[in-house]
């Protein structure tokens, strides 16, 4: 199973993800995921609202650096940025998420075949967003943090 995700670096929410049986990372799932992430965060809009500069940080995989992907990111109001070559530590939040997801979710899944894994992923991502605590969010889940931010309850962790 191959997977990719779009994660907010402020509130740690996985806004969109794609997974499929097999290896390789085609560009189309990445582009679909970008559109979904923007729509989930900002509603049915054509792009990120004016006045907000958001970066799309990715590694240097072909699907992410493809002309079509970078053009779509810009059209959505995102600024495409790639990590330095041979420097996975510069994408530390993504690397940390992958390790956490493997440890806390994949290790507890039935792994008998790809379809079994794929069937379990929606619940795992939902649990990560709704329940999984983050030390950087004062041990709140991503969505709990967002709800409290929306209510104005904790401006101490406001992300710009």
Regions found by a protein language model. Name each.
Residues 1-4:
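Short loop/turn microsegments at loop-to-beta-strand junctions
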């Amino acid at each position: 199973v191959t997977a990719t995700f779009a994660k907010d670096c402020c509130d740690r929410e996985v806004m969109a993800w794609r997974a499929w049986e097999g290896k390789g990372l085609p560009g189309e799932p990445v582009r679909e995921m970008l559109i979904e992430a923007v729509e989930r965060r900002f509603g049915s809009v054509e792009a990120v609202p004016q006045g907000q500069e958001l970066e799309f940080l990715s590694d240097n995989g072909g699907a992410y650096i493809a002309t079509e992907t970078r053009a779509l990111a810009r059209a959505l109001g995102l600024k495409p940025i790639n990590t330095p070559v041979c420097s996975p530590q510069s994408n530390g939040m993504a690397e940390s998420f992958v390790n956490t997801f493997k440890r806390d979710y994949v290790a507890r899944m039935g792994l008998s075949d790809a379809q079994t894994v794929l069937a379990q992923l929606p619940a795992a991502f939902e649990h990560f967003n709704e329940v999984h605590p983050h030390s950087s969010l004062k041990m709140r889940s991503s969505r709990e943090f967002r709800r409290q931010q929306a209510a104005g309850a904790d401006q101490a962790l406001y992300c710009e």
